[in-house]
Swiss-Prot record:
This protein is one of the early assembly proteins of the 50S ribosomal subunit, although it is not seen to bind rRNA by itself. It is important during the early stages of 50S assembly. It comes from the Bacteria. The lineage of its organism: Bacteria, Bacillati, Bacillota, Bacilli, Bacillales. This is Large ribosomal subunit protein uL13. PANTHER family: LARGE RIBOSOMAL SUBUNIT PROTEIN UL13M, RIBOSOMAL PROTEIN L13. Keywords: Ribonucleoprotein, Ribosomal protein. CDD domains: Ribosomal_L13 (cd00392). GO terms for molecular function: mRNA binding; structural constituent of ribosome. InterPro entries: Ribosomal_uL13, Ribosomal_uL13_bac-type, Ribosomal_uL13_CS, Ribosomal_uL13_sf. Belongs to the universal ribosomal protein uL13 family.
Length: 145
């Protein structure tokens, strides 16, 4: 009798990947990173278990936008007080806080559940080319597109 393989915490191998965001389009990079964080690039993917790998994104400040998104795309947040809405364009956010731009994009593609939160904690984004995770011996990951 054959049994379907179901991954659990004891039989998951996690790797560390470094992805260079220089010259990459924001959405294409984000969708691929979200897929790696969820573990969908593995044959052992199981929907209810966190089978994903750790991802380090470097050069976040050199991400690219297509079209007029740099000036036309606006991010809003609200403080829940009357008149407390704040807005910032994508280009301005890239100049001031490029890490938050990529984190918000990727975490928006993960599930809004406890499992999605757990998967989102395996993402590390840095604006420059340096990162403090050399001890984990991360592998370079080439994007498909």
């Amino acid at each position: 009798m054959r049994q379907t393989f179901m991954a659990n915490e004891s039989n998951i191998e996690r790797k560390w990947y470094v992805i260079d965001a220089e010259g990459q389009t924001l959405g294409r990079l984000s969708s691929e990173v979200a897929s790696i964080l969820r573990g969908k690039n593995k044959v052992t993917y199981t929907p209810h278990v966190d089978t994903g790998d750790y991802v380090i994104v470097i050069n976040a400040s050199k991400i690219e936008f297509t079209g007029n998104k740099e000036t036309d795309k606006v991010y809003y947040r609200h403080s829940n007080h009357p008149g407390g809405i704040k807005s910032i364009t994508a280009g301005e956010l890239r100049r001031t806080n490029p890490e938050r731009l990529i984190e918000n994009s990727i975490k928006g593609m993960l599930p809004s559940t406890r499992l999605g939160e757990k998967q989102g904690k395996k993402l590390f984004v840095y604006g420059g080319a340096e990162h403090p995770h050399a001890a984990q011996q991360p592998e370079n990951y080439e994007l498909r597109g």
